[in-house]
Regions:
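Glycine-rich active-site loop/strand segments that organize a redox cofactor
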Residues: 52-84
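A conserved FAD-binding loop/helix module that cradles the flavin
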Residues: 195-207, 366-390
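Conserved small/polar residues in nucleotide/adenosyl-binding loops
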Residues: 433-439
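An anion/pyrophosphate-binding glycine-rich loop and adjacent beta-alpha core
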Residues: 211, 217-324, 328, 381, ...
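Glycine-rich FAD pyrophosphate-binding loop
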Residues: 28-45
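N-terminal Rossmann-like FAD-binding beta1-loop-alpha1 element of flavoenzymes
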Residues: 8-31
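Short FAD-binding loop at a beta-strand-to-alpha-helix junction that anchors the flavin cofactor
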Residues: 352-371
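Conserved redox-cofactor binding core of oxidoreductases
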Residues: 96-183, 187, 231-234, 254
Length: 439
């Protein structure tokens, strides 16, 4: 069969995939594969913002590095943390060139907010829908590139390697299409749909990690899974959606089943602004003490117009569920949110498989340690996808492209167990996964 050749194939069209495409040399022919429409990705769901040292009069790299290491339990890759923090501001500034509209102060400077685990105001944001703002801006930029082909609503049925060539079997519009490249970037996101309750989009199924594993890539620390302490709890409909870290950053209180503050008992200094894993664990301690799994988040003491203007998306979503966060506490509970482990990569996003790169949540750069600091995820997606692009650019041979004749390996014929995904989701309830086995 014939495989159409590309210089680079990017699987995934969130921030990592889009930003990589924008930083690749314009002489390269690039194919981007999206599982759904371009905006239906995890990146677009990110609310809080991008953490970076933008105000050097009040912040510095060492403070951001320290916060990242503390949140990560000092299990971080310090070299990659330094890359993340020191190169991050350049990429945040570059977003402005693509039209990203960060909230501004009256003097025109970027408004930097505070989130849990940070000792300084350093989160650039767009209301409470920063991810969507960044994704839509980057999409506009990519669509202007004549060297990039985007296929939406695709299903990657197969990805294997023969020599230096990656072979792709893609289902698109009901037909099989075959592609090949010597440079593959996996930007496929996380594993949220392995869990019953997750803040992730429906496409976060971990298939990119599986494809990498099948090709011999190192897979690292899959037990490093983060639970966000404040997901809106709709137990009746078995749904949850994220209530941004920034709500606590703006002063919201965590309340127990008696609608009493409790974080001061466990974190007398940081209280509600402790890192995510700490807050989630403390909520479990409080649940054990009270015998109830009911928790609330309360910012209703703040000015109602401030709440509506600062958190318009969250306000409207909880209002649809029957709660007015300007007048009352809203029910929340820890929910699966982010994978810190994944496909092992080095400081420029390369795996141990020649020509295979990984970026974003599917990759394990080690910058997050055992627990990600709030708003470091979009920063990681930007910095390391750019470094991947720079590495590919450096090794670009400017070869002629055409088609490759090859046989694609046939499926082994083994039927998939019916309902296995649903069964896995049901056996991983949130109460069993806040604490890892070794803890």
């Amino acid at each position: 069969m014939k495989f159409k050749e590309y210089d680079v194939i990017i699987v995934g069209t969130g921030v990592s995939g889009l930003y990589a495409a924008l930083n690749l040399d314009s002489s390269m022919q690039i194919l981007m594969l999206s599982k759904r429409e371009l905006t239906l990705c995890n990146s677009a769901l990110a609310q809080g913002g991008v953490a970076a040292v933008m105000d050097t009069s009040n912040d510095n790299y060492e403070l951001h590095i320290k916060d990242t290491l503390i949140a990560g339990g000092y299990k971080n890759n310090i070299d990659n943390v330094r890359i993340l923090v020191e190169q991050g501001p350049k990429d945040v500034k570059n977003l402005l060139n693509y039209g990203v509209d960060f909230d501004r102060k009256q003097d025109g400077s970027i408004d930097l907010t505070l989130e849990g685990g940070h000792c300084r105001h350093r989160i650039a944001h767009h209301k409470d829908s920063t991810g969507f703002e960044i994704v839509t801006s980057l999409i506009e930029g990519v669509k202007k590139l004549s060297n990039v082909t985007i296929l939406e609503n695709t299903h990657l049925l197969g990805l294997t390697k023969r020599g230096d060539d990656f072979l792709f079997d893609v289902l698109h519009e009901g037909k099989h299409s075959y592609y090949t490249t010597k440079n593959t970037i996996l930007a496929t996101g996380g594993i949220g749909r392995v869990y019953d309750y997750t803040t992730n989009s429906a496409i976060a199924t971990g298939d990119g990690i599986q494809f990498a594993y099948n090709m011999g890539a190192d897979i690292q620390h899959l037990s490093y899974v983060q639970f966000h302490p404040t997901a809106f709890a709709d137990h009746e409909n078995r749904e949850c959606f994220l209530v941004s870290e920034a709500v606590r950053g703006e002063g919201a209180y965590l309340l127990n089943c008696n609608k009493e503050r409790f974080m001061h008992k466990y974190e007398p200094e940081r209280k509600e602004l402790a890192p995510r894993d700490v807050v989630s664990k403390d909520m479990m301690k409080e649940q054990k003490e009270t015998g109830s799994d009911k928790f609330y988040l309360d910012i209703s003491y703040k000015d109602s117009e401030f709440i509506k203007n600062r958190f318009p998306m969250i306000y409207n979503k909880v209002l649809e569920k029957g709660y007015d966060m300007t007048k009352e506490p809203i029910p929340i509970y820890p929910c699966q949110h982010y994978l810190m482990g994944g496909i092992g990569v080095n400081g420029h996003g390369a795996t141990n498989v020649k020509g295979l790169y990984a970026a974003g949540e599917c990759a394990h750069t080690g910058v997050h340690g055992i627990n990600r600091l709030a708003s470091n995820s979009l920063l990681e997606a930007l910095v390391f996808s750019r470094l991947i692009a720079e590495d590919i650019n450096k090794n670009n041979t400017h070869r002629e492209l055409g088609t490759l004749e090859a046989d694609y390996p046939s499926p082994d014929g083994k039927p998939l167990p019916k309902g296995i995904r649903t069964e896995i989701r049901h056996i991983m309830p949130v109460s069993y996964t806040h604490l890892r086995a070794h803890e």
